[in-house]
UniProtKB/Swiss-Prot annotation:
Taxonomic placement: Eukaryota, Metazoa, Chordata, Craniata, Vertebrata
Effect after changing R880G: Increases channel conductance
Name the UniProt record assigns to this protein: Cyclic nucleotide-gated channel beta-1
Highest taxon, organism lineage: Eukaryota
Record note on what altering L568E does: Loss of calcium/calmodulin modulation
Length: 1251
């Protein structure tokens, strides 16, 4: 009957083994059921439970939820224990009645079909025994039985069932926080310990309400055995008064009062604030411990059914400080206010989805799951830590099974589960309305931590091990939002070691209102701090958990702190660099650092010409060809394989032009000799075979041209060059040229068989004139001086017209008869030459010709005159055009020269300047062939101009150091803007102080940079490839004036780039612009750096002192300076010492200059002025030169030593001098930074003696 219910309702994931007691119960035919009375729930608890369930899911809770008995009902049951004893007899009689048996059978069947909650963890056996033997939990059986006996009537039972479901439908206020503060005493399992004196007396009854009526204690192993009564706590006076005020049991007024009382409890009541501050703020919290008994042989790792409940305290903001072991007390009234605001919560959809999954599994294994065993759980005592926490607001441990369950949930499963759940709920609701609801364990936030005994309890033994669960993150995940960060110190380990599972809890707020995916959970885990990171670890009896946990926390914290420190240091470094860059830009906006300057595009090498690559390709081919002759083996050049091209380019292929030359020669043979053979008697039977041989050779050339060459010529169609063989052949066959070529090869030679060999039959061979014109155009395109060929061709036209006229004259003479008249040819001499002479005189109309006598002669002569005038006029005009085109450049040059000379004469320019201008015209014309190259480039497109500029100027511009590293395309654009200018010898290219608007690149020749005081000293000579004028052109540092004079040394050809053109180019290349400015700034800085000029000696360095003079000075020193000679010698001696001092100072100055120049080469920046000033000061502060002892007489004479201490070390000492002739030499800075003053001082006494 209930098979469909079993298939519809979800079943537990595993089927545990049946105990012996269960087997015995199944054998019994009619088990006796203890009368169970639905206890009256506490109003506060009932309201709390009704709040935890939304209205839309109430119908589901009607089937599975059971209300806990309230403390007041428990007290009433304890006071009326005698009434319960009397009611047992009536209960047994009612149970034995037929209607009661049907209900009992129906209840037993439903209990077997409806799945029971599955729990995975148990307590220690010691704790279970303690719960069962003594304590407050043992007091729940007797009063419950008494109440059951009181409320066993079916009508009253139905009312209780309606009331219970009404309470679950309507929202209720949250449970007082006092209950949660008193629960840890029960969770410890120490029943023998009395309650603390400071706690109120109502603690015991409220804790009894935590027990479910269907959870018997583990002590009574037999169903009918009753536990020993434990001393019950004193009931409240208020509850006693309430009990005593009610009417008798059978009175109808009692029923009405009871209904009104139940309605009051069912309807929502105002929130009553509990007592606060009963727990000391510094008292340590206790970890949540759940003790669950696992039957032997069951699943080792049972699947846990998890439920997600939205926490009401997610958005709460309270000032709560944490202690190392637990959280501080939260005011109860604040928590209740927050709980009222968060009353509507959603129940998890996981249960519905799990039911669908289990339904599919049970359909496949229908036969095996008909006999479902009940899971026997010893007890479920859950203690929560914290003040102001409601039962539904506890945190739930997050385990690996939770994560697997989240992964299994999908969007499609949600929709299907909701649809199926609605259909099933309607069917189940109709059937459950006819029977009593079953006693189920209340579904809470932690379904894996709560359990329920179906029929009887089994104590924990060796066969029934226990596993203790500890919530290790009680302080890291407080129930209320805290301002202070959670403590990273782990709580002390649990006393149980080998059977403890450490489950750190995680804030459930991260999983609310949606089912997170695997990626979302990974991101949330990464976002957690080391104290909040969920870690699941099985304890090891050999490893202390506290040390391991602290090490993990410390290592994680140290890793995070190291990463944060590295990141902060990196940010500080970046900020410093950015600050320095901003400062640098504020000081000089044009300054760019090396990092900002773009990396120049790698300079691509110009493509190598094709002839250079061909030998490289041919080398490996040559290595393969060897020739073995006799005893030696040598390599020989392989035979080149010539293959006729598949297509021929008629514009650039020189072989085709050569072939056209042969075709034109054949055509000229026919055009010149056919008239001669027809008119003159030069073709005779004796030489006929020679004439025919040449004729047919020309015909073969014609035929090859038509069949081989013309059918392979490329052509342009739609802008594309067609190289397909079929298309080229079709193109030729459809052209006019093919028709003319075909007519030129008409086989009229077969008529020779009838009329004989007549040259006029070959006259169609002259129709191949189109090949002649094509040859002329191709030849002119490849000739450097095409006008020469044009002149020759024009002359040929004139000669051919004379040739035809001579042939006609001989034919006319032969027609009338040779020598018949005075006008005709008389037949004397060479007939062709005499006729040709007559034709020349006739066409040119020289005169002196014989007068025609006959009509034929007159008509023929008139035709000659008209032909001659027309032909010669055309020839002369064409000749003029040809010659004019050949000398057009020279004519332009002369016209420009004449205009310039006329201009200079008009303004009376000096002859020297005029001569320089004329020289420039002549040199420019002869060197370039034109005066201005830009005029030639104007007609060409940009691409061709760029190609020409690259070939002409790229090799020179690429050598310029200033443009190295710049964009290659920028250099190409710059090449098109360059102008070529020729400078004559000693011409000033630019002068110092002028405004710089151009930059110069030397193409050919040399220029000299002048400087010095007079501005005529040659500082440096620049050769081809050098550049100057770029600093003023780039206007770096605000200066755009020339810094030196530049003069052309000889004829110099320069490329000029205007400032305007360069700026237009650099606009499109900002990276190259920065690079050029940076280079120009460095060059300007190096040029402006003060260079130390070599000190000019007052007196030139003297030559070495003669030995004889030194000997004389030595003798004078001995004599002691007596007489005039002694005074003169002393004066000379002092003079020599001055010269020696000057020489030493000059050497010291040279050493200083060398040191500073080496520093400049290394690139060290800084002013050299301070260095220049330090040395003179040191020399000025030097003490006087020490007096040298007199020189011994036998010492060899040598040059006197310098008096300055600044001479280089290692220099040999001079000869010893007398003391009275010592002097003091000082170096002091001059008024200008680069000047120094040398002063020579003598003591006053010595000066007097010297005088």
């Amino acid at each position: 009957m209930l098979g469909w219910v079993q298939r519809v309702l979800p079943q537990p994931p595993g089927t545990p083994r049946k105990t012996k007691m269960q087997e015995e119960e199944e054998v019994e035919p009619e088990p006796e059921m203890e009368a169970e009375v639905e206890p009256e729930p506490n109003p506060e608890e009932a309201e709390t439970e009704s709040e935890s369930m939304p209205p839309e899911e109430s119908f589901k809770e009607e089937e599975v939820a059971v209300a806990d008995p309230s403390p007041q009902e428990t007290k009433e049951a304890a006071l009326t224990s005698t009434i319960s004893l009397r009611a047992q007899g009536a209960e047994i009689s009612e149970m034995n009645s037929p209607s009661r048996r049907v209900l009992t059978w129906l209840m037993k069947g439903v209990e077997k079909v409806i799945p029971q909650p599955v729990h995975s963890i148990t307590e220690d056996p010691a704790q279970i025994l303690g719960h069962g033997s003594t304590g407050d939990t043992g007091c729940t059986d007797e009063p419950n039985e008494a109440l059951e006996a009181q409320d066993t009537r079916p009508g009253l039972r139905l009312l209780l069932w309606l009331e219970q479901n009404l309470e679950r439908v309507l929202p209720q206020p949250p449970k007082s926080s006092e209950v949660w503060r008193d629960e840890p005493a029960v969770a410890t399992g120490a029943a023998s310990d009395p309650a603390p004196p400071g706690r109120p007396q109502e603690m015991g009854p409220k804790l009894q309400a935590r027990e479910t009526p269907s959870l018997p204690t583990p002590i009574p192993l037999q169903p009918k055995e009753e536990p020993k009564e434990a001393p019950a706590p004193e009931p409240q006076p208020g509850s006693q008064a309430q009990t005593s005020s009610l009417p008798p049991t059978r009175d109808p007024a009692r029923l009405v009062a009871w209904v009104l009382h139940r309605l009051e409890m069912a309807l929502p009541q105002p929130v009553l604030h509990g007592k606060i501050g009963e727990q000391e703020p510094d008292s340590p919290g206790i970890c949540d411990v759940q003790t669950i008994s696992i039957l032997p042989g069951g699943q080792v790792e049972p699947d846990l059914v998890l439920e997600e409940v939205e926490p009401p305290w997610e958005d709460a903001h309270q000032d709560v400080s944490t202690s190392p072991q637990g959280t501080e007390v939260v005011p109860a009234y604040e928590e209740e206010n927050k709980a009222v605001e968060k009353m509507p919560r959603e129940l998890s959809r996981i249960e519905e989805e799990k039911e669908d999954e289990e339904e599919e599994e049970e359909e496949e294994e229908e036969e095996e799951e008909e006999e479902v065993t009940e899971v026997l759980l010893d007890s479920c005592v859950v203690s929560q830590v914290g003040v102001g926490q409601s039962e539904e607001d506890g945190t739930r441990p997050q385990s690996t099974s939770d994560q697997k369950l989240w992964e299994e949930v999908g969007e499609e499963a949600k929709k299907e589960a909701e649809e199926k759940a609605k259909e099933e709920a309607e069917e189940v609701a109709e059937e459950e309305a006819e029977k009593e609801p079953q006693d189920w364990a209340e579904t809470k936030e932690e379904p894996e931590a709560e359990a329920e005994a179906a029929s009887s309890g089994v104590p924990a033994t060796k066969q029934h091990p226990e596993v203790q669960v500890e919530d290790t993150d009680a302080d890291s995940c407080p129930l209320m939002a805290e301002e202070n960060p959670p403590s990273t110190v782990l709580p002390p380990p649990s006393p149980a070691k080998s059977d403890t599972l450490i489950v750190p809890s995680s804030a459930s707020g991260t999983h609310r209102k949606k089912l997170p995916s695997e990626d979302d959970e990974a991101e949330e885990l990464k976002a957690l701090s080391p104290a909040e990171s969920p870690v699941v670890a099985w304890s090891d009896p050999t490893t202390p958990k506290d040390t391991d946990g602290q090490d993990r926390a410390a290592s994680t914290a140290s890793t995070n702190s190291a990463i944060i420190n590295d990141r902060l240091q990196e940010l500080v470094k970046l900020f410093k660099e950015r600050t320095e860059k901003v400062k640098e830009k504020l000081i000089d906006p044009d300054v760019t650092s090396d990092e900002e300057s773009p990396k120049p595009s790698p300079a691509k090498k110009a493509p190598e010409p094709a002839p250079d690559t061909k030998p490289a390709e041919a080398e490996p081919v040559e290595e393969e060809h060897y020739c073995d002759m006799l005893c030696c083996k040598f390599k020989h050049r392989p035979w080149k394989k010539y293959q006729f091209p598949q297509s021929i380019d008629p514009l650039t292929n020189l072989m085709y032009v050569l072939w056209l030359f042969f075709v034109v020669m054949a055509w000229n043979w026919n055009c010149w000799l056919i008239p001669v053979r027809w008119a003159f008697p030069y073709q005779t039977p004796d030489n006929i075979h020679h004439w025919l041989l040449m004729d047919y050779l020309c015909d073969l050339i014609y035929f090859l041209d038509i069949t081989v060459f013309q059918t392979r010529l490329q052509f342009v169609r739609g802008g594309d060059i067609i190289t397909d063989k079929k298309d080229m052949r079709n193109n030729y066959l459809k052209s006019r040229r093919f028709k003319m070529d075909l007519l030129s090869l008409l086989p009229l030679d077969f008529l020779y068989l009838k009329v004989g060999v007549n040259p006029l039959l070959r006259l169609p061979r002259c129709l191949k004139y189109m090949a002649f014109f094509e040859f002329n155009s191709r030849l002119e395109s490849i000739l450097s001086k095409a006008y020469v060929y044009r002149v020759i061709r024009t002359t040929a036209y004139l000669l051919y017209s004379l040739h035809l006229n001579s042939c006609l004259y001989y034919w006319a003479s032969a027609y009338q008869g040779l020598g018949s008249t005075h006008w005709v040819y008389d037949g004397v001499g060479n007939s062709y030459i005499r006729c040709y002479y007559f034709a020349v005189k006739t066409l040119i109309t020289i005169g002196g010709l014989p007068d025609p006598k006959t009509l034929f002669e007159i008509v023929f002569q008139l035709l000659n005159y008209f032909t001659g005038v027309f032909a010669f006029s055309v020839m002369i005009g064409q000749m003029r055009d040809v010659v004019g085109a050949a000398t057009a450049g020279q004519t332009y040059y002369r016209s420009c020269m004449d205009s310039t000379v006329k201009y200079m004469n008009f303004y009376k320019i000096p002859k020297s300047v005029q001569n320089r201008v004329k020289t420039w015209y002549e040199y420019t014309w002869h060197s370039q062939g034109m005066l201005d190259e830009s005029e030639l480039m104007v007609q060409l497109p940009d691409k061709m101009r760029l190609d020409l500029a690259i070939d002409v100027n790229y090799n020179i511009v690429s050598k310029v150091a200033l443009f190295q590293g710049c964009d290659r395309q920028m250099i190409f654009d710059m090449l098109k803007r360059l102008r070529s200018v020729v400078y004559l010898p000693n011409d000033y290219v630019c002068k110092k102080g002028e405004i710089g608007r151009e930059m110069y690149i030397i193409q050919a020749g040399q220029v000299q940079v002048l400087g010095g005081p007079d501005g005529k000293s040659v500082l440096v000579t620049l050769k081809a490839g050098s550049v100057f004028g770029e600093i003023s052109l780039l206007a770096v540092g605000g200066g755009n004036r020339r810094t030196a004079n530049v003069v052309a040394h000889g004829f110099t050809n320069l490329f000029i780039l205007d400032k305007k053109d360069l700026n237009e180019i650099l606009v499109h290349y900002p990276e190259s612009q920065k690079l050029l400015r940076k280079k120009a700034r460095r060059m300007l800085r190096s040029n402006n750096k003060p260079k130390e000029e070599k000190s000019v000696l007052i007196l030139p360095p003297r030559a070495g002192t003669p030995k004889l003079f030194n000997a004389a000075l030595a003798m004078t020193g001995k004599m002691g300076g007596k007489g005039a000679k002694g005074g003169k010698l002393a004066h000379l001696r002092a003079r020599l010492k001055e010269l020696a001092a000057l020489e030493a100072a000059a050497k010291q100055q040279e050493l200083v200059e060398q040191a500073k120049s080496s520093q400049d080469v290394k690139g060290e920046e800084g002013s050299a002025a301070p260095d220049q000033h330090t040395h003179p000061k040191e020399a000025a502060t030097d003490p006087p030169a020490p007096r040298t002892p007199p020189e011994p007489p036998g010492s060899p004479p040598s040059s006197p030593p310098p008096a300055s201490l600044g001479r280089p070390e290692g220099e040999e000492e001079g000869p010893a001098e007398p003391e009275e002739h010592s002097v003091r030499i000082c170096m002091s800075p001059g008024p200008e930074p680069g000047e120094q003053i040398l002063s020579v001082k003598m003591p006053e006494e010595r000066e007097e003696k010297a005088e």
